[in-house]
């Protein structure tokens, strides 16, 4: 049975982009360089509400590649895949191809 997680409030479900352990030329990278620091947004919550009850939407959308803090988020395992839940304000930025 396939499970689908839909985040609540201003939370974002991210699948980590695994950084390679070595460069294309064969140089081994330190373990810290391969930690989760970017990910693909899989799902987003509807947003949060301000003090007047007005909806504040999440700043990213499904499919975006985002820059994440080195620590934080909540690890979630669905089936064989691992994801992380972050709050919208924890995302450091979005990454774009030139």
Swiss-Prot record:
InterPro entries for the chain: Chaperonin_GroES, Chaperonin_GroES_sf, Chaprnonin_Cpn10_CS, GroES-like_sf
Gene Ontology MF terms: ATP binding; protein folding chaperone
Domain of life where this protein originates: Eukaryota
Stored PROSITE patterns: CHAPERONINS_CPN10
Transmembrane parts of this sequence: none
Cellular component GO terms, alphabetical: cytoplasm
Subcellular location per the Swiss-Prot or TrEMBL entry: Cytoplasm
SMART domains: Cpn10
Keywords assigned by UniProt, alphabetized: Chaperone, Cytoplasm
Function: Seems to function only as a co-chaperone, along with cpn60, and in certain cases is essential for the discharge of biologically active proteins from cpn60.
CDD domains linked: cpn10 (cd00320)
Lineage: Eukaryota, Viridiplantae, Streptophyta, Embryophyta, Tracheophyta
Subunit structure of this chain's protein: Forms stable complexes with CPN60 in the presence of ATP.
Principal cellular location given in the protein's record: cytoplasm
Family the UniProt entry places it in: Belongs to the GroES chaperonin family.
Pfam annotation, one family: Cpn10
Protein name as catalogued: 10 kDa chaperonin
């Amino acid at each position: 049975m396939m499970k689908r997680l839909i985040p609540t409030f201003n939370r974002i479900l991210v699948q980590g982009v695994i950084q390679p352990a070595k460069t294309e030329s064969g140089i081994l990278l330190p373990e810290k360089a391969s930690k989760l620091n970017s990910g693909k947004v899989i799902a987003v919550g509807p947003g949060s509400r301000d003090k007047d009850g007005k909806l504040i939407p999440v700043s990213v959308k499904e499919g975006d590649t985002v820059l994440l803090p080195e620590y934080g988020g909540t690890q979630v395992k669905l089936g064989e895949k691992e994801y992380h839940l972050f709050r919208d304000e924890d995302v450091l930025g979005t990454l774009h191809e030139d």
